[in-house]
Amino acid sequence: MRLDELPKSARIEDRRGVTVARGGIGIGTVVVLGLIGWALGIDPRLLIGGAEMMSRSGGPQQQADAGSTTSTGSPSDTMGQFVSAVLGSTEAVWTDYFAQAGQTYKPPTLVMFSGATQSGCGFAQKAMGPFYCPIDQKVYLDTSFFQDLERRFGACNVGSKTCQFSQAYVIAHEIGHHVQNLLGVLPKVQQAQRAMDQTEANSLQVRVELQADCFAGVWANRGQAKWDFIEPGDVDSALQTASAIGDDRLQRRSQGYVVPDSFTHGSSAQRTRWFTTGLKSGTVASCDTFRNEQL
């Protein structure tokens, strides 16, 4: 992945190395990446349905002081510069898209942390994987997740330069949730899930996640047109990652069998299909997972 021409984002809070006191444990309306549950032996159904949790708790969790060592702006280290470049590219792509629709894109902040931190949706831990919190409109990322993605789950070839594009796909997926929030998709889904049983809520959540995968593909398409940043092997690497974090593959790895009714992010085939859909079309209209009967 070529990064040289990508705009750098300053909308980063660097909390790596910052120790925080644990506050409330509510996860709120966190939208999580699928690796969380089945890979670590945690039922992911406990980590979604955040709107219900928020209604019971009465609002966002009180955040602890992140400490005076939190810095803002583009970090100077290699990983920080990479995240800044990917985030900057998403800002440019989605700013253009919203402008074409006569709207204004309000970019999220990305929080880099190590181990644990506080979010507007509650206490965040490394085991949760990257996630987007609609309450504070921030993406939370413990970058050691990328090591797990590569070494433990074979999401891309460890040490290969193409792993960068896989990592960028993960970030673009979370930004996709922010786009969903701005478009009003997340609030509607959360409202609908309140009236559903767990199986129905899971099924709807899958459509949310697959749309975020498609939006990540839209970012890749439009970013390629702007900066020609995709190198040979990059797309295959991203597809390998999407497949590696499919619910069926994670369940089979963790428990030896698959329970489709418990899927919350989609199968490997579905995730790769929807990322590819966005990548080929470059249009948000192609990402309507809610009206598509065949996922």
Regions found by a protein language model. Give the residues of each.
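Catalytic Zn2+-binding segment of zinc metalloproteases
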Residues: I175-Q190, Q224
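Short pre-active-site segment immediately N-terminal to the catalytic Zn-binding motif
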Residues: Q147-V170, E200-V206
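Long amphipathic alpha-helical segments used for membrane anchoring, targeting, substrate engagement
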Residues: M1-S76
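Catalytic zinc-binding patch centered on the HExxH motif and its immediate surroundings
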Residues: A116-D148, R152
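Pan-zinc metallopeptidase signature
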Residues: S243-L295
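Extracytoplasmic
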Residues: F82, S89, Y105-P108, K126-M128, ...
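Active-site recognition of the HExxH zinc-binding catalytic motif
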Residues: L35, W94, L141, Y169-L182, ...
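Short helix/loop segments within enzyme catalytic domains
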Residues: Q81-Y105, E200-L250
